[in-house]
Amino acid sequence: MLNFSILGALEIRTPGGQVEIPGDLQRTLVQVLLAGEGRHLSGETLVEEVWGSAPPGNQANALQAHISRIRRRLRALEPERRPSRLVTNPAGYRLVVEDGELDAVNFVRDVQWAEEMLLSDPAGASRLLRSALAMWRGPVFGDLPGGPMCRMVAVRYEEQRLWAMELYFDAELSLGRHKGILAQLRETHIDHPLRERFCEQLMVALYRSGRQVDALATYQNMWKRLSEELGVQPSPSLRRVEHAILSHDPVLTAADATLRQ
């Protein structure tokens, strides 16, 4: 069994440790195949992802040479495996990844499970989300972002990461752990200043910590940023949180309430 990691720089691990894939071209090619998530990818797609607008003169031969090197490398890691993980047929190229072998797929699965658990078992959801978020070692694919397809996949996984963080903060707020996440929430809101849900969660955490003035100031700063940068007003959800703070709505201090609607 191999373990592939793309939530950060590409890593391939065997039971014996980490495996090196030499050269940026081969690393990028493996990343593209992993981004395909089991789909066949055409040679044209692989060439565009690896070489962009400057492909080699004989791109078909160059691609096949790198494919052959990767296939030999993978075969050396699993000499008993038949057929090869790297499949070639008229539809293109496909890297076979078994269930549980790709960290990004495992991450998305765990986040989905945690979302389903959130209302019935927020403590369990929080633990699962912490574990899932710990899979991330850096930006998807690290410092080799690849071509259009890889960049699109990276954006999708990054959005899943932010969603997981929202769910994690919801779980912690529902457990009454607002003080424990306050610093992390503030940092996350600074990193993603236009994401309203983080602002809502920070406002609730501040209010519960006895910092009503800071909670309202956070709203005002968000309102100003949305107006100046996007030309829009705060969402109804964000305005509801502000109104609840101004009216000292008891829902804000209920252990199981996060105002997500």
Write out the residue ranges for each language-model feature.
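Intrinsically disordered, low-complexity protein-interaction/activation regions
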Residues: 1-183, 187, 250-261
